[in-house]
Amino acid sequence: MNKKIAVLLKVIVSLGLITFLINQVDFKGIVNILKNVDITMIVYALILLTIQVFIATTRWQFVLKCQKIMLDYKNTLQILWSGLFFNQAMPSSVGGDVIRGYYLKKQGMTLGRATLGVLMDRLFGMVGLVFLVLASLPLLFELVDDSIARSGVLFIALGISLALLFIFFTDKLPGNFSHLKVIRGFYSLSQVGRRCIVDHYNGLIILVISILIHLISVISVMIMAAGLGINVEWSGFLLIIPLVTLMMVVPISIAGWGVREGVMVVGFGYLGVAPEAALALSILYGLLMLVVALPGGVVWTLKRNHTPN
C-alpha cells in the first residue's frame, strides 16, 4: 500500500473514532472537566512521563549491549527522543523506528544490526507490557463482571503471549520452514532475543526496566485522573492502562489517537467512570505524551541535515 494512503487512512481512523466518541458524550462536560484540572497534578504527571524517556534510554542501552553495541547515553537518548517525536508528533510515513534505525546506522552499524537494535527494544518493551497485563488478570475478574469483556481480554493476552513465544523460538522451527522469507526475518531477532534473556544479568535488568516503564504510565494516568477529580482505585488503573497501551500498539491510527480514547472510555466505564471524564482523561494523556515528545523535535532539527529524505 502506498505510504501516503496508509497515513491518510490512519488519520481517518483517528479522527473518525474521536468524532464518534465526542458525539456520544456531552462535549461541554468534557470541556468543563478539562477547565477545572489541577495544574499541579498535571505537572507531576508530565515530570514522570519525561523521566520515563530517560529510563527507556537506559533499557535500550542494555538491549544494544546484547548485540555488543556500545553507544554512549547521550547519543542513545538523542536517537530515542528523535524517534519518539516522529511517533507522537508527526503524522508521516517516516516512523520513529525508521529514524532510530537510521541514526544507529549513522553510528557505523550495518543496516541489519541497526534494524535489529530497534526491533529488540520494541520486543522487550512488549514483553514487559504483556508481563504486566498477565499479572493484572486477577483484577479483571475482580473488577469486571462482563463475560464478553473478560473473554476478549483473555483472548488478546493469550494471543500476544503466543506471538512473543513464537518470535523467541522462531529459529527452532523445523528446517523446511527456514526457506520462508517471513520466517527468516525473525531468525536473528529470535537468536539475539533469547541470548539476551539467558544472560541473567542483562535479561533481568531489561525485564525490570520494561515493567517499570509501563508502571510509570499507570502512575502518571492515576495522577492525571486525580487532577481531573476522577476517583478510581489504583487496581483499576493497573488493569486498564496496560490494556490501553497494548491496544495502541495496533498500527491503525496516528500515535494511538482514537484507539486510546475508545479503550479508556469502555474500560473505565466498567469501573463506573462517566464517558466524559474518561474521554477527558484520555485526551489529556495523549496531549502530555505529545508534549514529552517535543524535545525530540529539537534534537531532530539539530540533526536534520543528516535525516533521510
Please tell me what each predicted stretch does.
Residues 96-105, 254-269, 283:
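Re-entrant/interfacial helical elements at transmembrane boundaries that shape
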Residues 83-92, 242-257, 261:
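Transmembrane alpha-helix interface/packing and boundary motifs in multi-pass membrane proteins
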Residues 99-103, 115-118, 130, 209, ...:
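Hydrophobic alpha-helical membrane segments of integral membrane proteins
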Residues 67-68, 99, 106-109, 228-229, ...:
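Short helix-loop-helix connector
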Residues 119-139:
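Hydrophobic alpha-helical transmembrane segments of ABC transporter permease domains
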Residues 74-78, 92, 96-97, 107-123, ...:
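Membrane-interface alpha-helices at helix entry/exit sites of multi-pass transporters
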Residues 1-81, 139, 143-249, 280-309:
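Predominantly cytoplasmic-facing regulatory/coupling regions of multi-pass membrane proteins
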